[in-house]
Amino acid sequence: MLSYRKLAMRVLGRPLHTGGGIDSPRPASQRAAALVLTAALLTGAAFPAFADTYYIENGDITISAGESGNDVTQNNVTTKNDTNTIITNQKTDKASSNTVTINAGNDKVEVTLDNVNIKADSGSALISKGDVTLTLKGDNHLTGGNGGSSSYGGDGITSSGSLTISGGTVTATGGDSTSSVGSGGSGIYSVSGDVTISGGTVNANGGDGKNGSGGGSGIDSSGGVTVSGGTVTANGGDSKDGDGGSGGYGISSCGVAISGGTVTANGGDGGSGSGSHGGNGIYSSSGVAISGGAVTANGGDSKDGSGGNGIYSSGGVTISSGSTVTANGGNGEDGSGGRGITSNGGVTVSGGTVNANGGNSDYSNGGDGIRSLDHVAISGGTVKSNGGSGNLSGGNGIISYDIDLSGSLELTAKAGSPNGKALSRVGSELDLNTIKDKLDPGAKVTATDADGKVIQQVSIPRPVEPEEPSSSSDGGSATPSAPASFLPGLTVTDKDGQRISYTSIRGNNVLSLSVGRFTASLHASLSTLRQLRAEGIDTITFQTILCSTTLSVDELLAMGGEDAEVVLTHHIRSSTLTVGGKAV
C-alpha cells in the first residue's frame, strides 16, 4: 500500500527522495498543491485509488462492489474503488490461514488471484456472493479447513450467486470430515447460481469422509455447471474408516452443459457396509448436454455397496457432434457394478464418439453400458457400449424400453457375462432386421456376446462412386447424372412418394440407375422406354441399398400400350413390378 506522502509525490509528478541530500526548493504552486492534497487525504476526502496488490499473509481480505471499482478491506483499512484488485502471497510455497470474502451485492466484482495459497483453519478458503469473476494467474491453491465442531469439512470455494472462473490454474480442495455425522467439503460449492468455467485449469477435489460419513463433491452446484473451455478435473472424496459412507460426486449439479475443453469427473470410493456406494462421475438432477470437448466420467468403486455411475441424469442426456465422451461405471465387490450412462429420461446421441462401459461385480450383477427408463436414440456418431461382468448376471450393452437406431451411426453393443444382452428392449434382444430401413448408407450396427462374438450385424454399404465418363459405341457415352430431370420420363420416388435424386450411368446398351435408399420406386412410361430403345438401350438395372433388379426393355414394351406406366418398387430386399397398374 502507498503512504500518503508517496501518493502525493506520484500525483505531483515529482521523484521521491529518501536520502539525506538537500533538494532545491519547489515552486510555490507545487508546494500549495501538495498541502491541499495532503489535507484532503487526512480529512477523508474521496480520491481515485490506484490498482493495488494485496498480500493474503497480512490478514483476511473482504471485497465488495464500490461506486467505480472494488472496495477492499484488510486489517480494518479500506481502499475505495480499486480498479484492478490482485490478491497474492508473499511466499507461495507456504499456505496462509487467512481467507477471502467477496460480496458483489447487486453489482459485479472481478478479482485476480495471482499464485494465492490459502488453507483455512476452518470453513471455506474463499467465499463469493453475487456475480463474481475470478481471473487466475499462475498456480493458485484454495483449501477448506477440516471439520471442527460441525464435523463438516470446509469448501475450497463457496459461492452464492454466479461464479465465473477463467485463465491460469486453481486447485480448490474441500476439507475432510471429522466424524460420522458430517461429510467432506466440496472443492467448489455453489449454494445458488451457476458455476461457469471458460478457460484455464481447474482442479476441484472433494474432502474425504470419516467414520462412515460421505466424501465431498469436486464441484457441487445447486444451479448449473457450464464448461466451454479449459481443463477441468473434478474428484469426489472417498468415504473412509466406517460403515455406510458413500463416495462424493465428481460433478453434482442441477444441470451440466459442456461445449468445449477437457473435463474429467471421478466419483469417490464408497466405504464399507451395505449402505455405501461409489460416487457418480457426473450427476445432474435435471439434464446433461455435451456438444463439444472431451469428457471422461468415472464412477467410484465400492466394497460392500454398488459402484457409482459414470454419468447419471434424472432428466435426459444428449451428446452431439464434436464431442468425445467416455463414461465408466465403478466396480462393486458385494454390490452391483455401476452404469456407464444412466438416465431417468432419454439418452440421445446424434454425433461424436461415445464409449460407455458398465462396472464389474465380484458377487452381484454387472452394470449396463447405457441405461434409460425412457428411450435411447442414436442417429449418428460412433458408439461403443459394453455391459460389465458379474457373478449373478452380466450387464447389458444398452437397455431401455425403446431403442431407436437410425441415420449414419456406427454402433457396437456388447453383452456382459453371464446372461447379459447386447441390445435389450423390454427384456428381449433387439432384432436388427427391424431397423434396416431407418439406416443410411455407411451405417453399421453390431451386437456381440460377452466374448466379442458377433450375434447380429447390419451394415449398409455406401453407394459406389460412378466411373469417369467414357465413350461407347453402343447406347451412348457412359456419363453419370444425378437429378431425375436429366432423364426425362424416368423418375424415382421414396417410400412417401416424394421425388428424389438418383445416379444414372449409360454404357454397353445398359442404363443403370441407383439410389441410396432401402425403399424406392422407379417410374417410366412405355413411350419413354421406346425412346430409350431407339437410342440403343436394351437393358435397365435399378439398384437400391439391399436390392438390385434387371429389366429387359423389349419385354416391358410387349406388356402394355402407348400410355402405360411401368413402376418397379424395392423394399429392403424384395421387389415388385407393375405395368399399367397390373402386377407382373
What is each of the regions a protein language model found here?
Residues H17, H141, H277, H375, ...:
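Histidine (H) residue identity feature
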Residues M1-R26:
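N-terminal secretory signal peptides that target proteins for export/translocation
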Residues L2-V11, R31-L42, A46-S470, D474-G476:
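A composition-driven surface/loop motif
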Residues I86, K94, K108-D114, K119-D121, ...:
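Long, contiguous ectodomains of secretory-pathway proteins
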